Amino acid sequence: MMPAAACFPPGIAEEQLLADLRRLCWGAADILLAYGRGEQPPYGFPKALSVDEGGEGPVSAADLAVNQWLLDGLAQAYPDAGWTLLSEETAKEQLTAGEPLDAEWLWILDPLDGTKDFLQGTGEYAVHLALVHRGEAVLGVVLQPLLEDLWFGLVPEGRAWRENRAGEQQPAQLSSRQALGELVLVASRNHRDQRLEQLLEALALGDTKAIGSVGGKVATILRGETDVYISLSGKSAPKDWDMAAPEAVLKEAGGAFTHADGAPLRYNTGDVRQAGCLIASHGVSHQELCAKAAEAMGRIDPGFAV
C-alpha cells in the first residue's frame, strides 16, 4: 500500500514525484555501479574515474556525474516547480556565509555520500535527496546502489519503506532493544576522535558495527541491525546534505534524530554545518541516550554546545 498524500508545493502530485524520484535514483545507481566496475557509465558521462582531493574530502567524476544527473533530471521534470535545488557540489557557488537561501521549498542533495568508501570499493555509500520545507525535511530518499535498496520517508503521515528495482516494498523494521547495554552502535570507519571514544565509554552501549556513509548507517537502524548512531563535531562537522535525507526517513520510520539536548535538526539556517552532538536512534531509548550523552559531554568537553 502506498502512503497517503504528503505536503508538497502547489501543483506537485505525490504519485508522479515518487515515480520521477525512482527513475532518477535508479539512474544514479546505474552511473555509480558502472564507475565502480570500471565500465563506461550510461547517459554519456566520461569513463575515467578522476578524483580531486579537495579540502572537504575527495570529489570524484562519479560525484559530479550523479550530481548533474539529479539536478538536470529534477529541473527538466519540474521546470516550474516552486522549489530551489541545492547540492553538495553546487553549495560553494550558491551559498553566502551566514545567509540562508531564499527558498520556502528546498531540495538538498548529496550525490555520493561516502566518496571514500566508494573509491575504496567497500560498497558502503549512498545517494541522498531531501525536500526541505521552512527548515524541516519533509521527504527523505536514501539510495544504496549495491544493496539495491531505495528508502523513502514521507511527512506528515509517518511512513517509511524501502523498495527494490522491481518496486517490491518493505516497511522499516526498527529493533525493540531497550537497555543501553544491549543497543548496537553503528559507527564510522573514518571519523573517530578521543572525545567520541570517551563518550562511547560513558554510554556503555553494546556491540559496534562499522559502516561508511551516514545514509548507510541510518539504513542499518531502519533494518533493525543497529540502534544508535552518534555524530560528534570537532574540527569539521557534517553538513545539511549528509543529514537531511537520512533524518527524514528515520523520523518517519518511528526513530529519532536530534541533538543531545533534544533539539530537532534544522536546515537552510545560513550555516550548513550540523555541529554538536547529534544522536540518531531507533527511538525506544532516545531520551535516555540524549540525557546521558549531554551529561557526559559536559564533563568531557565543558562548554561544547550539544
Spans of model-derived segments:
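N-terminal subdomain of lithium-sensitive/metallo-dependent phosphomonoesterases centered on the IMPase/IPPase/PAP
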Residues: 1-112, 198, 285, 302-306
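Short, charged helix-to-loop "capping" segments that act as catalytic/coupling loops
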Residues: 52, 74-88, 93, 156-159, ...
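Solvent-exposed beta-strand sheet faces enriched in polar/charged residues
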Residues: 86-88, 130, 268
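DPxDG-like acidic metal-binding loop motif
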Residues: 97-164
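Short helix-loop capping/hinge motifs at secondary-structure junctions, enriched
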Residues: 159-161, 166-169, 284-290
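An extended, acidic
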Residues: 173-306
